[in-house]
């Protein structure tokens, strides 16, 4: 118990000097963290797009629409209606898997600026927070029965040395997928948090 309280205190980062015992408050911290990551992902993607020529943007967007993110292999709600029908535990489980899938690829986003270097540690903190929420909602014994199938490849041959055009495509893909997945996690955690308030309107 003392260990859990310590972890919650670290996650709060000064939000409160007292141990966090209320699930609603822990959800608020997790939602705040993923909102920060989503905004950061949007900014990084926007900055990268701004550095491209108009034709490069058009071609890369066209290619991305025909491609898939690695995390697409993680089964998740197909629309807002299915999201709203999903249980809190299911939304937490999917969020955990999405965040976990970025632990290794996020290293390629680091470097060049302070915000970029914050991504990996913030993902790690978010993952810890979601895991605590999962433990509070379930014993976790059979939470990830198919986890062995979720060893996603780190975006194929992304870490090899490509030519200039291929490097642009891979960077575009990485940033676009990161933005997409952080939006998903933000949505799932927001809906799950709302479920703790029976009188709240959780409509997306």
Curated annotation (Swiss-Prot):
Gene Ontology annotations of biological process type:
animal organ development; growth hormone receptor signaling pathway; positive regulation of growth; positive regulation of receptor signaling pathway via JAK-STAT; response to nutrient levels
Q: Name one GO molecular function term.
A: metal ion binding
Q: What does the UniProt entry say about where the protein is found? A: Secreted
Signal sequence, start to end: 1-17
**Which residues take part in binding Zn(2+)?**
36, 186
Task: Please indicate if the UniProt record lists Acetylation as a keyword.
Answer: no
Instruction: Assign the protein's first listed, main location to one coarse class.
Output: secreted
Q: Which residues carry this modification: Pyrrolidone carboxylic acid?
A: 18
**Paired cysteines (S-S):** 69-177, 194-202
Tell me the PROSITE patterns matching this sequence. Answer: SOMATOTROPIN_1, SOMATOTROPIN_2
Q: Which keywords accompany this UniProt record?
A: Disulfide bond, Hormone, Metal-binding, Pyrrolidone carboxylic acid, Secreted, Signal, Zinc
What does the entry list under GO cellular component?
A: extracellular space
Record carries keyword Zinc? yes
Which family does the similarity line name? Belongs to the somatotropin/prolactin family.
Q: What does this protein do?
A: Growth hormone plays an important role in growth control and is involved in the regulation of several anabolic processes. Implicated as an osmoregulatory substance important for seawater adaptation.
What is the protein's given name?
Somatotropin
Which species is listed as the source? Acanthopagrus latus
């Amino acid at each position: 118990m003392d260990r859990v309280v310590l972890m919650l205190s670290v996650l709060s980062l000064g939000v409160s000097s007292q141990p966090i015992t209320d699930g609603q408050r822990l959800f608020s911290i997790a939602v705040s963290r993923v909102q920060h990551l989503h905004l950061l992902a949007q900014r990084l993607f926007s900055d990268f797009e701004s550095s491209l020529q108009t034709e490069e943007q058009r071609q890369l967007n066209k290619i991305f629409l025909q491609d898939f993110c690695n995390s697409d292999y993680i089964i998740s709600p197909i629309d807002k209606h299915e999201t709203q029908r999903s249980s809190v535990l299911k939304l937490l489980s999917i969020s955990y898997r999405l965040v976990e899938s970025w632990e290794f690829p996020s290293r390629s986003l680091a470097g060049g600026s302070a915000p970029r270097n914050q991504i990996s540690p913030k993902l790690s903190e978010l993952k810890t927070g979601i895991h605590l929420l999962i433990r509070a909602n379930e014993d976790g014994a059979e939470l990830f029965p198919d986890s062995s199938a979720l060893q996603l490849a780190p975006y194929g041959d992304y870490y090899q040395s490509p030519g200039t055009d291929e490097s642009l495509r891979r960077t575009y893909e990485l940033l676009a997928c990161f933005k997409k997945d952080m939006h998903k996690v933000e949505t799932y955690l927001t809906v799950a948090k709302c479920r703790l308030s029976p009188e709240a309107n959780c409509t997306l």
